[in-house]
Amino acid sequence: RKAKELLFTAGVIDAIEAHRLGMVNRVVPRDKLEVSVLKLAHEMSKTSVKLRLDTPTIFAAVPNVDRRCRGAYAVVAMIAGYGVLAFRDPYGIRPAVIGYNETESGVEYMVASESVAIDSLGFRVLRDVAPGEAVLIDEDGNFYSQQCAPRSSLNPCIFEYVYLARPDSLIDGASVYEARLAMGEKLAEKIKREYHHLDVDVVIPIPDSSRPSALQLALGLGVPYREGFVKSRYIGRTFIMPGHAVRRRSVRQKLNAISMEFKGKNVLLVDDSIVRGTTSREIVQMAREAGARKVFFASAAPPVRFPNVYGIDMPTRAELIAAHRSEEEVATELGADALIYQDLEALKSAVRQVNPMLTRFETSCFDGNYITGDVTSDYLLAIETRRDAARDSGDDAEGAQLDLNLVAAD
């Protein structure tokens, strides 16, 4: 079987289109090409004999990708004429899970980032791809796996459980929904311990990901839980939208307050996290306009004080509302009567409560501890400078960070 260069352009290019574009057996520089996939193609070309692939050759290429590509990645690549290869970074930051389906003709396999994709197709979860592991499913349906990293450890990104993942998914053996319920329990404990003077009449979630935490928080406080905002399904995630004015306008278009749930009440709004603060500030104002007497705000996550460089398009530190402010100052910026953040250790405990086997997490956006050990202040400054330049020129700032996040080392 002859090796072909792997191509990735945030979509799929088949062999016919690749031939038409003159892309076969060479790497074509393109914006936002995934460095890890390009390195994989390059390494397979180097290790193959006369451009012919076999299972050992493919597995032999992965350790060099792990060595040369720093950071977080979970890759699923289709190798034309051979099969599907999946591998995960040695730190296990980004998730990858294997599913299977038993049929009359044999066992079928699939790999996805979340178990919900496996469930929705009628497959069953087999297991997670281990950090540093590669999994290969050939065209005949044979399943192979190999640990390709000499050193590996599981450090799942805790922001997956806070916000990114769907609540009906399992990530590294932990139910996202149960983890968010536990986050609400921890928040309730903190409020009863440190904010017992707050006279909360009702708990209202900011749709959608904060609902489980808000529900459990209300139960823990013994106050009613109400849906106070109706969400439009046509507006995307506001914290990754470019431009402050666009984000502010999008919040109003995305959410509409139900006045009867706010009028004359002391409301406790609950969100999964506070990033820039644009959404939270607008929502606090909307609650007041709907008639709330007092507006308290609770975050199921700790203050986001540092940028994420492991695959989340998070703002630079200068754009993070909590980066250089105390919690009291953030509350003032939001216009809230009180602000309650989750403690980082409580957040970790909430996820461990669901799966005690998870002992370490990637938490850099909260504590500035970048577990790969190679993220320097100069690197963070380079990201910020490039994003600022992209924003000033009107280019896509998201791409500016993506190019820098996927760093290849010689």
Regions found by a protein language model. Give the residues of each.
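Conserved short alpha-helical segments that host acidic/polar catalytic motifs at enzyme active sites
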Residues: K39, K46, K50-P131, L136-D201, ...
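Short, glycine/charge-rich flexible loops or terminal/linker lids adjacent to PRPP-binding catalytic cores
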Residues: L219-V267, T278, R305-P315
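Phosphate/diphosphate-binding loops
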Residues: A60-N64, V116-A117, L121-V125, V129-E133, ...
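Acidic, divalent-metal-coordinating active-site segment for phosphoryl/phosphodiester hydrolysis
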Residues: A10-E17, V275-R276, S280
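CoA-thioester-processing core
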Residues: R1-L7, R20-L21, S36-A41
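Extended, hydrophobic alpha-helical segments in both membrane/secreted and soluble proteins
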Residues: V203-I206, S210-L217, L221, Y225, ...
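PRPP-dependent phosphoribosyltransferase catalytic core
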Residues: N64-D66, G81-G83, R88, Y100, ...
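C-terminal long alpha-helix characteristic of the crotonase
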Residues: A15, V24-V49
